[in-house]
Amino acid sequence: MRDLTCGFIGLGLIGGSIAKALKNQQPEVNIIAFDIDKEALLLAQTEKITSTCYEQLDDVAAKHLGSCDILFLCAPVSRNDDNLRLIKKHLSENCILTDVGSVKTPIHKTIDELGLNESFIGGHPMSGSEKIGFANANALLFENAFYFLTPTKQVSQDKIELMKEVIGIIGAIPLILDCQKHDYITAAISHLPHVIAYSLVNLVNDNDKDGMMKLIAAGGFKDITRIASSSPVMWQQICLTNTDNITELLDKYIDELSSMRDALKAQDGDTLIDSFQSAKEFRDSFMNASGSPVTKLHEVYLYIPDKPGALAMTATILALNNISIKNIGIMHNREFQKGVLRIEFYDEPSAEAAITLLGQNNYTIYHR
């Protein structure tokens, strides 16, 4: 691939992770960035990720960013319209304009209104974190993750192919999709689940007068409500920009819950088992749908002694051998899971390397 210059309007978790992944895989890539967070820009320069940074999106910055081969819009979605209007007059005809928002139809409408259809390929990496900011950016964030691309009908095939190549470089799997279909799919598998997770946590909170539910909440409850720790502001914006799709699916979900309630009241075991079995079969098929580790969690469970420094020692053993940890935590309720310490890795090779290494250090390990 030819040497590229990539621009970023916004260098937070997603923008920063894309920039880091590009720089790690293609050190010759030139990266230019704008962000209002001075510390993020300083950190990016210290880590030698960026060559040029701007704290203001003035004409000088807009002209430089508009001349890039690819310009990533990674600022908050609410800023996209203003940023696009600032960039428009400086945008090179060869520049690919892309975003990372999880709702695509609104920005496609703005692109159409501004006459930028020949430049725009919508983007949505299906990967993220509850954490925010460049300080939490990770070059492995998109490893084996789906990355939706929603090109306009007017953008050239050459630009689409280049964008697919870049997505592959950062370790993700590009999927081409119509923007409206994308928004319905993500409403079902991402946006509605967040609404449900927030609602379920609020339900428990409202009914937990003595704090006992909170005390024992772990395992399954934490797994299905983990996403309720995501940014409330970000999810407010997402829900308000994909309202029609979310409410349509929410109505269907309410109907599903009503059917379950009716079956419970009627002690209708057949309906319950049919529903549970159908859901289990569909859920169990997720891991094998693509023959890829995309949907698989790379988890290791192990026992550690209950003494000061035990967890830190485990993490240090892995870090000294360049094995990155995606998530780590003590399992206080392990009714359906073996091991007291749960470690999640970014990919299967890392998990396998950790199993070998920790086994050599006499840990009792369970791999999931």
State what each model feature region is:
Residues D58-L91, C95-I96:
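Rossmann-like NAD(P)-binding element
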Residues S119-S156:
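Active-site capping/gating segments
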Residues M1-Q56, A61-L65:
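NAD(P)+-binding Rossmann beta1-loop-alpha1 motif at the extreme N-terminus of oxidoreductases
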Residues L141-S229:
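Internal alpha-helical scaffold of NAD(P)-dependent oxidoreductase catalytic cores
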Residues D210-A279:
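Interdomain hinge/lid region at the active-site interface
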Residues N83-F134:
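Rossmann-like NAD(P)(H) cofactor-binding subdomain of soluble oxidoreductases
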Residues F282-R368:
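A conserved regulatory-domain signal marking ACT and ACT-like small-molecule sensing domains
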